[in-house]
Amino acid sequence: MALNHTALPQDERLPHYLRDGDPFASKLSWEADLVAGFYLTIIGILSTFGNGYVLYMSSRRKKKLRPAEIMTINLAVCDLGISVVGKPFTIISCFCHRWVFGWIGCRWYGWAGFFFGCGSLITMTAVSLDRYLKICYLSYGVWLKRKHAYICLAAIWAYASFWTTMPLVGLGDYVPEPFGTSCTLDWWLAQASVGGQVFILNILFFCLLLPTAVIVFSYVKIIAKVKSSSKEVAHFDSRIHSSHVLEMKLTKVAMLICAGFLIAWIPYAVVSVWSAFGRPDSIPIQLSVVPTLLAKSAAMYNPIIYQVIDYKFACCQTGGLKATKKKSLEGFRLHTVTTVRKSSAVLEIHEEWE
């Protein structure tokens, strides 16, 4: 079961929530809490409507969804869960200048945030790996069916459930953040024992480092594949140059996905690692809240990156332009199939991303 926190004598080796008096009292000024509250309110509203719209539009064409789209929609589910289940707790607490939901609410909020956050990251990992295999190994797209996507979703939720439930069964806990109006995984457990260090290291590796490595590897390989493929077929027909715009867009999308994730979560991860293995008291309270607020913004712009840009919801702008572009690419595909077999395979890469 989760640890039962009670007041203990003052000791520098104790975590902040055991030695700083009321752990749920805000350590920020009223003004800072109000700013944080309004910021999270705006982020929460935009995220809820953005991800809700994505799910609504997807439900209208649910029978036509491709396997990769099904996995990507799961990202919107995770982000919507963070916005609906998590953000109201912090927003109310910011406006009240203290955490008002007690230890039970703290553990629920910490679990929900970690659960949907982990699910979101693992979904990103699955999508990036799927795209890497489909772009770099064309035969992969032939056998991937909708049922495989649903199996992948089940594995994602099982993975997230396993790691986020472990702190509730005695291997850790969810505790207040140093600034008092939010809760998180007990990173400070690593300061107390070797067992705590092992647990935190496992969390960091399986829920952050490994997924991040897969995402970066996948998109670097995709970028390299698209660039090399363009060079191989560019001299066969001048019409291949029309795909250069698409190539640049794909490169930018991959960079946005990686950059968006890194910008949102790496600062929070750095602070968490320092809290676990460094000198947590050396981090100013006012500074510790910034990575938390930044990480919470990921639920807002993820639907923009994954749904609007990558899956081209904006393609509804002009049907004529889309039809012309499709016709041009299909014509070139037929031409290359009859002349150079290799070039047709490469063109599949570009069409797969359209």
Swiss-Prot record:
Pfam family, one: 7tm_1
Main location: membrane
Biological process terms in GO annotation: cellular response to light stimulus; cellular response to UV-A; entrainment of circadian clock by photoperiod; G protein-coupled receptor signaling pathway; hyaloid vascular plexus regression; phototransduction; phototransduction, UV; visual perception
Tissue: Detected in brain and retina and cell lines derived from neural retina.
Cellular location(s): Cell membrane
Residues annotated as transmembrane: 34-54, 75-95, 109-129, 151-171, 198-218, 253-273, 289-309
Topology feature Extracellular, residues: 1-33, 96-108, 172-197, 274-288
Presence of the UniProt keyword Secreted in the record: no
GO molecular function ontology, one term from the record: G protein-coupled photoreceptor activity
Glycosylation sites: N4
Chain segments annotated as coiled-coil in the UniProt record: none
Positions in the Cytoplasmic compartment: 55-74, 130-150, 219-252, 310-353
Function in brief: G-protein coupled receptor which selectively activates G(i) type G proteins via ultraviolet A (UVA) light-mediated activation in the retina. Preferentially binds the chromophore 11-cis retinal and is a bistable protein that displays emission peaks at 380 nm (UVA light) and 470 nm (blue light). Required for the light-response in the inner plexiform layer, and contributes to the regulation of the light-response in the nerve fiber layer, via phosphorylated DAT/SLC6A3 dopamine uptake.
Name of the protein in its database record: Opsin-5
Organism: Homo sapiens (Human)
